[in-house]
C-alpha cells in the first residue's frame, strides 16, 4: 500500500510555508494594532458545543462534521469553525468577570475540519484566521471589526474588494421576517430543491443562502428582511452604514445574504473579490449577541469574522500579488575536507548566535558543488574553510554577488561578525 496524505488535506512545504508565515504575521501585526490577543482552543470539542451553537439544521452539522465517539463514549467533533470554541472558552474561563477589561478582543489562527468535496481553495482540513470581540453592543464595534478586515486586505495588497452588508435584525425582526418568507415560499415549495424544502420547515432564512439554481430563481423576488426591521434594529443598521461612510469603506447591501450559521443577528457581512471572472468570498462574519448566554454565560454581545487562509493565498496568487518571503541565507560555509569539520561547526554556531542565518556543507562535496548550493540558497556571503584556513586562524569571506573577497581572523568572526558582514556586502 502506498502511503499518502488523506483526501482533502495538504502538505505545506517550506517555500509555501514562508508565504503562510508572512500572511499570518501581517494578520497578527494588524490585530495587535486593534488590541486583540491570541487564543488557542482545542482542535476537537464536545459535539454539543458545535451542534447547539452553529445550528442543528445547518449543512455544517448535518453533512460536514467529523464526529465520533471516543473510548470513553463521549461524542466528539473536530472543530469545523472557530467562533463556537472561542465562545465556549470565554464562558468556561469566566472572561465575562468584572475584573476582566471589556471588550474582550481575541483572535485565533488554526486548522478546521469539514467533510466536503475538495476543490480549489477549499479542503477537508483547512486553516482559518478569525477574530471575536465580546462585551460591546455599540455599532462602532461592528464597524471597527469590519475596518480591521479591510485594513488587513489593504496591507496584503488584495485588489478590488467589495463589502457586502446586511442586517438580520433582532429576534423580533427575524421572527416577523421568517413568517413573511414562509408565506412567500410555501406556494412554490415543489419547485425548491430537496434541501430547501426541508429548510423551509426548519429554518427558512437558509433558503436564501442556497446555491441551487431553482432556489435562486425562487428567492429572486423574495421580500427583503430590511423591510421587517423594527426601530431598534433599523437604528443599529443605520449607524453601521453611516460609520462605514465616515471611514470611506464602500459597501453594497445584499438582502439575500444570511450567512450559513444560525447564531447571527443584526449586522452580517462578507468581503468579496473577483478571481478568474468569478466572485469569491474572502472573509465573512457578523454579530451574535445571544451566543454567550446560550453557552451558560451572562447576556453578552459579540461580533467577529473568519477567513480561510487557503482561499486568501489562492486569491493573492491569482491576483499576482508578490509576497515578500525569506531573502535567503546570510552566510554559507564551504567546508574542505574532514579536517575542517569541527571548526566549521564551531564557526557556524558562533555566527548564528550573533543573529545571522547560516548553513554549511555536511556532505563532503567538491567545492564547486558547495558554491552551487550557496547560489541556490541565495547566500550573501560565502566563507571557505579548509586545512590552510584552520592552520592560519583566518578565513576568506566572499561577497556572493560581486565576488569581492576579504580575509578575517576567526576571533573577529566569533566576536564581531555584524561589522565584518556589513563591510563585506557593502
Curated annotation (Swiss-Prot):
EC number(s) on file: 6.1.1.21
InterPro entries recorded: aa-tRNA-synth_II, aa-tRNA-synth_II/BPL/LPL, Anticodon-bd, Anticodon-bd_dom_sf, His-tRNA-ligase, HisRS-like_core, HisRS/HisZ, HisRS_anticodon
A Pfam family: HGTP_anticodon
UniProt keyword list: Aminoacyl-tRNA synthetase, ATP-binding, Cytoplasm, Ligase, Nucleotide-binding, Protein biosynthesis
Enzyme class, first EC level, given as a word: ligase
Catalytic activity: tRNA(His) + L-histidine + ATP = L-histidyl-tRNA(His) + AMP + diphosphate + H(+)
Assembly, per entry: Homodimer.
Family membership noted in the UniProt record: Belongs to the class-II aminoacyl-tRNA synthetase family.
Protein name: Histidine--tRNA ligase
Organism: Streptococcus equi subsp. equi (strain 4047)
Amino acid at each position: 500500500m502506498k502511503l499518502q496524505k488523506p483526501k482533502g488535506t495538504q502538505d505545506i512545504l517550506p517555500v509555501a510555508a514562508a508565504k503562510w508565515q508572512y500572511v499570518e504575521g501581517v494578520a497578527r501585526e494588524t490585530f495587535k494594532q486593534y488590541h486583540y490577543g491570541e487564543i488557542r482552543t482545542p482542535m476537537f470539542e464536545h459535539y454539543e458545543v458545535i451542534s447547539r451553537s452553529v445550528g442543528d439544521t445547518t449543512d455544517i452539522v448535518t453533512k460536514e462534521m467529523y464526529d465520533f465517539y471516543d473510548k470513553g463514549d463521549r461524542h466528539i467533533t473536530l472543530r469545523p469553525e472557530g467562533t463556537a470554541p472561542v465562545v465556549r472558552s470565554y464562558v468556561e474561563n469566566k472572561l465575562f468577570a468584572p475584573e476582566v477589561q471589556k471588550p474582550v478582543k481575541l483572535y485565533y489562527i488554526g486548522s478546521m475540519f469539514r467533510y466536503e468535496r475538495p476543490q480549489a481553495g477549499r479542503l477537508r482540513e483547512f486553516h482559518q484566521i478569525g477574530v471575536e470581540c465580546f462585551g460591546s453592543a455599540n455599532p462602532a464595534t461592528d464597524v471597527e471589526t469590519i475596518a480591521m478586515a479591510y485594513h488587513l486586505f489593504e496591507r496584503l495588497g488584495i485588489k478590488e474588494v467589495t463589502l457586502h452588508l446586511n442586517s438580520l435584525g433582532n429576534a423580533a425582526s427575524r421572527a416577523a421576517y421568517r413568517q413573511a418568507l414562509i408565506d412567500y415560499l410555501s406556494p412554490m415549495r415543489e419547485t425548491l430543491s430537496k434541501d430547501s424544502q426541508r429548510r423551509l420547515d426548519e429554518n427558512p432564512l437558509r433558503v436564501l443562502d442556497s446555491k441551487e439554481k431553482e432556489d435562486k430563481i425562487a428567492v429572486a423576488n423574495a421580500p427583503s428582511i430590511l423591510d421587517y426591521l423594527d426601530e431598534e434594529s433599523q437604528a443599529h443598521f443605520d449607524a453601521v452604514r453611516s460609520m462605514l461612510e465616515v471611514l470611506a469603506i464602500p459597501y453594497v447591501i445584499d438582502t439575500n445574504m444570511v450567512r450559513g450559521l444560525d447564531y447571527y443577528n443584526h449586522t452580517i457581512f462578507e468581503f468579496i473579490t473577483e478571481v478568474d471572472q468569478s466572485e469569491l468570498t474572502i472573509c465573512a462574519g457578523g454579530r451574535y449577541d445571544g451566543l454567550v448566554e446560550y453557552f451558560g454565560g451572562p447576556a453578552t454581545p459579540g461580533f467577529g469574522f473568519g477567513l480561510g487562509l487557503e482561499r486568501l493565498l489562492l486569491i493573492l496568487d491569482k491576483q499576482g500579488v508578490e509576497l515578500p518571503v525569506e531573502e535567503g541565507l546570510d552566510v554559507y560555509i564551504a567546508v574542505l575536507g574532514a579536517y575542517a569539520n569541527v571548526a566549521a561547526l564551531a564557526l557556524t554556531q558562533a555566527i548564528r548566535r550573533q543573529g545571522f542565518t547560516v548553513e554549511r556543507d555536511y556532505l563532503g562535496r567538491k567545492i564547486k558543488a558547495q558554491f552551487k548550493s550557496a547560489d541556490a540558497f541565495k547566500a550573501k556571503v560565502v566563507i571557505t574553510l579548509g586545512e590552510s584556513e584552520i592552520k592560519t586562524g583566518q578565513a576568506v569571506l566572499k561577497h556572493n554577488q560581486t565576488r569581492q573577497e576579504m580575509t578575517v581572523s576567526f576571533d573577529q568572526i566569533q566576536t564581531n561578525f555584524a561589522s565584518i558582514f556589513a563591510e563585506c556586502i557593502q
